[in-house]
Amino acid sequence: IAVVDIRGTIIAKEFLNTKDYPVLNNFIEVLSERIVMIAEENGGYEMVRSVGISAPSANFLTGSIENAMNIPWKGVIPLAAMLRDRIGLAVAVGNDAHITALGEKAYGSAHGMESFIVVSLGHGGVGSCIFCNGQPHLGTGGYAGELGHCCIVDGGRPCNCGRQGCLEEYVSDRGIVKTARELMAASDEPSLMRDLETLTPMTIGECCDKGDAMAQKVYQQTGFYLGIGLANYATLMNPDAIILTGELKDASRWFMEPTEESFNEHVFGNIRGKVKLLVSILDNHERDVLGASVLAWTVKEYSLFK
């Protein structure tokens, strides 16, 4: 939760963990109270124009979270309407990848670009947002950009969405860990990864830094699949750039080179060398807060109290 002014300055912020609230109505109640409290402490509630929210599987067109797999509540949640009715202000809800792209365009690596793609690699999976001619492309139902659920391996790993071979099962944090476990199970080759108490993208990367061949193979395979996915995306959309963001961007030093190699191998020849592959320069939390503030300005002002 944050207060952001018209210049994009983050005035105040605090954290609320959705996992602490298994009952949706309890979360909405606490969230509403915190929004009012942080506003009153920083200029007054009457100074707030609107609220922007970043959420997984959110549909900007309906203001709902729809069948998200990585939050405690299931089904369709009309979050914008629920919150608006409690706090009496305009509320806009956007898909987390869409919010990330808004933050990148306004304040980050995509500043000044008209056509670009933001790909978020994180703990929950892989999301993306397409900007075309200066505007986000949401699709008919608001689901455009689900790169993580594009099938990249026929008959591959089962995905939480119910299908097999989705990209996020190979390049998200859980996908990287699965690759490491598969490689260790398939070979008796010694590896520092076998001695790790906890396998994570970062601990695997640290093994890479120590020259561990199997750990390096994990990220070579990750980059190979990510490069194919990005090449298909670039061939379809012909953007100025593809920007990688999310929790896994800090691991990019281990997978960026094989990603670029695979991208150049698989992208359409006429645009090879013309699409930049970039890693976001913004802090993840700051970027998403700023992106949500940009979204808040797009919704028509509404208030029960002004």
What are the residue ranges of the model-derived segments?
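Phosphate-binding/catalytic loop of phosphoryl-transfer enzymes
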Residues: 50-177, 291-306
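ATP-binding/phosphotransfer module of carbohydrate and carboxylate kinases, centering on a glycine-rich
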Residues: 2-48, 85-87, 109, 154-158, ...
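Short, conserved acidic/polar surface loops in the N-terminal third of protein domains
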Residues: 1-4, 62-64
